[in-house]
Amino acid sequence: MTQIKNSTLAPSPKPVSFKEALKFWIKLGFISFGGPAGQIAIMHQEVVERRNWIGENQFLRALNFCMLLPGPEAQQLATYIGWRLHGTWGGIVAGSLFVIPSIFVMMLLSYLAVAHVDIPAVAAAFYGIQPVVVAVVIEAVLRIGKKALKHRVLYGFAVLAFVCIYFLKVPFPAIVALAAIGGLIMKQMLPQVFCRGQFDFNTRECRMEDQSDSFGNLTRPSVAHVIRTFLVCLVLWVVPVGAVWLWRGYSDTLTQIGLFFTKAAFVTFGGAYAVLSYIADFGVASGWLSMPQMLTGLGLAESTPGPLIMVTQYVGFLGAWNIPGELSPLCAGVLGASLTTYVTFLPCFFFIFAGAPFIEAMAGNQRLQAALTGVTAAVVGVVLNLAVWFGFKVLVPDNSVDIFSLSGAGISLLLLVKFHFPIHFLVPVGAVAGVVWKLLL
């Protein structure tokens, strides 16, 4: 995660008009490349350093809160900042505009990926993207592992998670739950390992970051507020998903898409990479898409603005396109993609609007921090499973080594790890290399 300095003498935040903030949120939706680290860095530079709309402590506290939640932390952070500046409507506008540009871009790319894949140049381009994706996932294992695995016990969490998901086929939500319980148990024996603040070895206590700053008077934390927010979001979920259920029936692909991605939205701890194998497992087993198509979708999501979790929209589009029922594939695909995106991000708004008033209490909860330390370590094993799974599919198809894919993955990994080459540039380079290899050599 991007390191952000604390500033002790920062000037007081200045008021900002809704119109001025709206212009920034529109702009952010089109420039939010670079994954969550890049997106969070852009927001910090713009809203804290350059524009001084919120203070450093407020930004850091909001970021810590969003990192505790399932779902894309950068989109949730934008929602929080919008809420902090202009209340509920500010949060809705900020969170929505963060993803709207990528919705249309991914919709177009998803269509090209299935409707025109029989064109040799298009097929070759997608072939070239796949080894880049393998390298991206391997780099994610290295990056997340470096940050999360600070002790041999945490390495044990990662290894057990890999064994459970790769060999024993334990569902991802169960791994999250078991890792959280393990974190709570191990905190009693090794509190210094499961402390996310500063551990005092004399008192054997974990000292969390000072949380004394006020968050203003937007919304007071209360159970009534949480219940109201939950009921509103529940109605907003029931209306479209229920309508599809009544129209198409429970077993229809569109209904299953709505139900599955609702469940997935609540287990995306550790970012999009952590839940990808869960989504890919279900999607491939359900006949929604093939493994090469899943790899293509991840590559497209990496190279477009917006959160990486937008790969779910691609899966929803292809699932409905491939099993459209009596609808046309295009109509079914658009409906599937739209429903997927809606149920993926609706919980994000609920988490922010219901939880932001409780942010100080949550940030200092040591048991919660210990549970999340266990989950974060387990996520490394889950992402490693994804790397192994993708690697075999791409590098050793049909039990024979693919020289182009092996070379492409190796070169891509070198560029990512050694030279920090931007992913959104590397994916198009891979596409061009695939075209050259397939059509010109």
Residue ranges and their predicted role:
Residues 1-69, 80-304, 308-441:
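Multi-pass membrane proteins that catalyze or facilitate reactions on polyprenyl-/lipid-phosphate substrates
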